[in-house]
Amino acid sequence: MSSSITPSLIAADLFSVDGLVAVVTGGATGIGLMIVKALEENGAKVYIIGRRKEVLDKVAKEEAKHGNIIPLQGDASSKPDLERIVAHITKETGYINLLVANAGISGPDPVRITPSTTLSELQRDLWSLDPSIFAQTFSVNVGTAYFSIAAFLPLLDAGNHKGNVVQSSQAIITSSIGAFGRVPLAHYAYSASKAAVTHMTKQFATALTKYKIRFNILAPGLYPSEMTAGIVKSFEQLSPEERATRVSPLGREGNTEDMAGCILWLASKAGAWLSGNVVVSDGGKLSVTPSSY
C-alpha cells in the first residue's frame, strides 16, 4: 500500500534533530560532550547532568552554538537528585524526546596477564581487589542507567504525547565494546558491568513496547575522554602498523564526528524504526578481537 505522504529522502530532513528535547547524563566531558554538541548544534535543546557545576557551566557557555545547552547539577546515581532534576524539567519544558544515559566509570585498574605471569600472581591480583570497588562499578555503570530510565519515563511518555517530532521517545544507553570482547580491555568488573547494562537495556526495549518508548545501546570503542586519556596518550608514539593492531584496524581512535554521526542517526527520524539495537562504533576493533558480538 502506498502512502499519500511523499517521504523526504533529503539527509537534512532525515537526520534532523531540530526541536528535539534531550537529557544527557555525564554530558559535560568525553563521549557525553560529543553527543551534547552534536545534538545542540543541530537544533536540539539539551539538558546536561553532571556533578561538577563549574564544568557544566563552562560547557553551556563555551560549547552551545544556539544557547540551548542547559546545565543541571546533580548525581545521576542519586534518586533525590534525579527526582529534583525531573521536577525542574517537568516544570520548565514538560517533556523530553530523548534520554542519553551516559554516566559511568572505568572501575578498577585492569589485571594484566603477560607470558611470564604465574597463576599465583594472577590469583593474588584478582583477590586483592576491594569488593566495594567491584560493587561500585556495577552500581554506577548499571544502577545509574536503571534509575535514570525509571526517573525519566514520565517525561519520555509526555514526549510521545507532545508529538513535536516524528520519531517516538527513546532512551539511548552508553555501553562499551568491553561488553562483547573476550580479551579484557579493562578490568573484569568494567566489562561485566557493560555487558549487564547492555542486556538490561534490551529487556527494557521489550518490556516497554506497548508504551512506544524505544531503547537502543551505543557501544563505543576507544574515544578520547578523561577516562581514556592515559590510554590515548600511550598510543601516540605507535607506528601506523602498531596502531592498526592495538587501537583499531582503521589506525585511530574515534572522534567527535564519528560520535556525532552515530547519535544523529539514532536520535533523528533516520533511526525512528530502531529499538533494542546495539550500535558499535569502534573502527572495526571487535572484528579483529575475539568477541561474542
From Swiss-Prot:
Enzyme's top EC category: oxidoreductase
MF annotations from Gene Ontology: oxidoreductase activity
UniProt keyword terms in alphabetical order: NADP, Oxidoreductase, Virulence
InterPro entries: NAD(P)-bd_dom_sf (IPR036291), Sc_DH/Rdtase_CS (IPR020904), SDR_fam (IPR002347), Sec_Metab_Biosynth_SDR (IPR052178)
Pfam families membership: adh_short_C2
Keyword NADP in annotation: yes
Keyword Oxidoreductase: yes
Enzyme active site: 175, 190, 194
Similarity remark: Belongs to the short-chain dehydrogenases/reductases (SDR) family.
Family annotation (PANTHER family): 7-ALPHA-HYDROXYSTEROID DEHYDROGENASE, SHORT CHAIN DEHYDROGENASE_REDUCTASE FAMILY (AFU_ORTHOLOGUE AFUA_5G12480)
Name the record gives this protein: Short-chain dehydrogenase/reductase PhomF
Organism: Diaporthe leptostromiformis
Source organism phylogeny: Eukaryota, Fungi, Dikarya, Ascomycota, Pezizomycotina
Gene: phomF
